[in-house]
């Protein structure tokens, strides 16, 4: 299993390098740009004494639920969209339910007005509201984090990392 752990860590390193390269490219272009990156799920890679690996368990672990949510704005974008930039800064420490927020945040970043955009779900908006976070179980049903049977170790990880549970 050490090879599996190395493989997963290498994907994290690759993604980190890719995002850094993309940001560098956007900076060199001196473009008016915004970038949002997130992941659809986390991964267990032997993170604790349970030796869990992969994802999609009926009862996920903290490591399957905690995913990155990164927004980068170019200097030109920040200067032209001060309110959006300030809203992102205001909301940066708040918990994000990525599955609910990505669509609305991207519409907000792109400046698209539509009846489908809910500003209370956009991290790039001052109206952003913290919502309960859900896990889509193996029967395609959303379940509140406190209703999926998380283990004590996983709840402790949320608290240790100052993340809201639930």
PLM-predicted stretches and their roles:
Residues 2-166:
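Catalytic domains that recognize anionic headgroups
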């Amino acid at each position: 299993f050490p090879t599996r752990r190395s493989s997963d860590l290498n994907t994290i390193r690759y993604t980190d390098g890719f995002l850094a390269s993309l940001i560098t490219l956007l900076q060199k272009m001196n473009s008016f740009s915004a970038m949002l990156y997130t992941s659809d799920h986390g991964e267990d890679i032997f993170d604790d004494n349970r030796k869990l690996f992969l994802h999609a368990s009926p009862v996920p672990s903290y490591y399957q639920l905690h995913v990155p949510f990164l927004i980068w704005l170019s200097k030109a974008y920040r200067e032209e969209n001060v309110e959006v930039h300030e809203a992102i800064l205001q909301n940066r420490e708040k918990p994000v339910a990525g599955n609910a927020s990505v669509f609305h945040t991207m519409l907000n970043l792109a400046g698209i007005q539509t009846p489908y955009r809910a500003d209370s779900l956009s991290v790039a908006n001052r109206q952003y509201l913290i919502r309960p976070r859900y896990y889509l179980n193996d029967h395609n049903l959303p379940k509140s984090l406190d209703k999926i049977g998380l283990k004590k170790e996983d709840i402790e990880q949320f608290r240790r990392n100052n993340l809201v549970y639930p």
